[in-house]
Amino acid sequence: MSFLRPSIWRSSPMQMVQLFVQIEAAHDTVDELGKLGLIQFLDDNEHVNLFQRNFVNEVKRCDDMEKKLKFFEDQVKKEPKLQKLLPDNMLSVVDDDSQMDELEGRFDELESELKQVNANQETLQRNYNELIQLRHVLTKDSVFFQENPNLIEGEGHEHSARSPLLAEDQHVSEVAKQGVKLGFITGVMNTDKMPQFQRSLWRTTRGNNYVKDARIEEEIIDPQTGEETAKTVFIVFFQGERLQQKIKKICESFGANIYDCPDNSFERSNLLQKVTVRITDLYEVLQRSKDHKRQTLAGIVPRLYSWKKKVLLEKSIYHTMNLFDYDVGRKCLIAKGWTPKDKIEEIQLALRTATTRSGALVPSVLSIIKTEGSPPTHFETNKYTSSFQEIVNAYGIAHYREVNPAVLTIVTFPFLFGVMFGDVGHGALLLLSALGLISLEKKLAGKKLNELIQMPFDGRYVLFLMSLFSIYVGFIYNECFSIPMNIFGSQYNLNSTTGLYTYQHTDRVYPVGVDPLWKGAPNELVYYNSFKMKLSIIFGVVQMSVGICFSLLNYLNQKGPIKIVNILTQFVPQMIFLWSIFGYMSVLIILKWVVPYRSFEVDKVDPPFILPTIIAMFLSPGGTPDVVFFSGQGAVQTALLFLALISIPVMLVIKPLFMKRFHFQEVERKKLGHHEEEHDDEALYTGHHGEEFEMGEVFVHQVIHTIEFVLGAVSNTASYLRLWALSLAHSELSSVFWERILIGQVERGNPFLAFVGFGAWLGASVAVLLLMESLSAFLHALRLHWVEFQNKFYIGDGVRFIPYSATRILSEDDE
């Protein structure tokens, strides 16, 4: 398994390689290397404008083809039945063997045909819409004129232009009885514009108009967007030519379609019959046009994604070739890139395959070159370890050959989550969720998922381990939905005389975790708080100590005398400082646990307190402790305090002095011409290769680093108390939900209330504990690893290894 390989502890050893590829074999060579995904090419033309590179025309050509494919895909997605036939991703489609010239010609033909069909269909749809709207205008107007026959057929009468044509209290029938002949404009507009349209008419005509409207029941299809639009028929009555021109302009500004409607009922009836016949004929033509378009798109669908895959890979190949240097004399391309050392043979095999495939007479050549640049960082992961590696990478990419925190994170991250979320019941529900995601792995892998589903699916194995550790720690806490599990039988008996619980066997305890009798005891919180708080301190000291040990592994990987200096002036004093104070406190905690200071015998004494002991260690060094854990405690505490204090100047002063000495020795070697390679490595690490050595800058940096560690040792240890705080919050919330929501309803004896209470309890547990509380525990575990653990050793200033890979390119495009 990959997590047992050395490449997961440290990044894979990388090698800079140089490729000499004949121009006729370049395309096939890049294609074969893309299938491997083992080389990260460098840009040898970074000072050349993108539009002046050798293969820019080929890239533009691929861009044009991609635009046409995007046009085809948009047309297909407008047809729901055809859209269902599209594959989920391009990785699963079969490669297309067609040549680019052939595809380009095919795309031009299809694009021209589809655009012509769309133009014809848009014209037909617009004409069809016009006829549909005219039919509704004739129908609605006929109904209105039948209700008011005298409105446009009466004799003209004088009417003041200064007063409204229709006052608010004057109905249209009254106007008809007066025999006033009015002009009218009728048309159709979007329904959502009608209120504003009517207000504009009223203000412009000063009320000298009358508007009648009716909603068209069927939806009108917009010929440009293809979406259905709600339309309304309107008719505006007015008096005078000047108002007619104003009303027409308002109608045009609102995008209304105006129709000439005869004022004679016989003419309206004849026109309606003609329009109905034309609608029937045009509908048949429109359907044939749509069928032709569907047939054209149906021929595109099976090959669309294979075409997209072909064009996308071709574009990536030419884009990669633009990174290469072109040797005009040799007519070859020269490429540089990083690759893992153990993969060079696979690359050479791919080069030979590409040479044979292209028919080139001169084989491609791979040469290994040396460089002072820092290589990219590459860790070999699988689907199980990749999620944990991404957790680390989110903080920062490891420096080249730096110890990888993900090795320990695979275990410690879910474990610390379990410490905060420890509950057998909730952990089991979380486990079911994780197993469900894992079981759907093959079905969901590679598909486009909702963001809320994608995140837990990507972290399904992290979720799986978190649930297992939650169950494990839940057994330690002896909590299942906040209630204890008396699996092995309590070790306490109730003494009927004293009314107190006593041990059945003084030489034996509850086999696994906390005795169930502690749950519900008067001093339950006191006991659990003490246990979890001390446990948090121990976990914190141990994890920070492992972090300092990881820094030792980083120092051992260095070359030259700086290795010994870092070990003696960084690792040793840091470990001494941490364990002289907080390590000693952890030892006292364990000592207090294992030593039977108090029993139910009269002659036993109360256990000593740890906090006053640590405070007295600093305030009264060398004095006799008031609280004694063991003989010779005063001398031990004095020695530990001395070691902690002396370690600070060791971290602060000694390393800058050694670095200054190494710098002068390096200068002398350069003068004598004996500058060895390991000193290049040393200078690379110290950051002063080819730079003037500044003692003040180095000393200030060391002061900052020392202060950060000393203060961080205190604050980081206190930060681990969040393990206790979140565990307490989870336990108390779970207990409240159980007792108040579920048990409170069950005790009422009403089955319906019990059912409702169970539903409310389950909903609250899922929403608050499984979602909100688990997210909170996840974020706190993330903080403990990124800050408290990784700042002891992790530089995190590396560069990710991103090789040219066809699989990665296709996957990113699918996203």
UniProtKB/Swiss-Prot annotation:
List locations, semicolon-separated: Cytoplasmic vesicle membrane; Endosome membrane; Vacuole membrane; Lysosome membrane
Molecular function per GO: ATPase binding; proton-transporting ATPase activity, rotational mechanism
Give the chief site where it resides.
membrane
Topological domain (Cytoplasmic) residues are 1-402, 441-454, 551-571, 660-706, 789-815
Listed GO CC annotations: contractile vacuolar membrane; early phagosome; endocytic vesicle; endosome membrane; lysosomal membrane; lysosome; pathogen-containing vacuole; phagocytic vesicle
Q: Which InterPro entries would you find in this protein's record?
A: V-ATPase_116kDa_su, V-type_ATPase_116kDa_su_euka
Assembly description: The V-ATPase is a heteromultimeric enzyme.
Entry's family note: Belongs to the V-ATPase 116 kDa subunit family.
Task: Report the protein name in the record.
Answer: Vacuolar proton translocating ATPase 100 kDa subunit
Q: Which organism is it from?
A: Dictyostelium discoideum (Social amoeba)
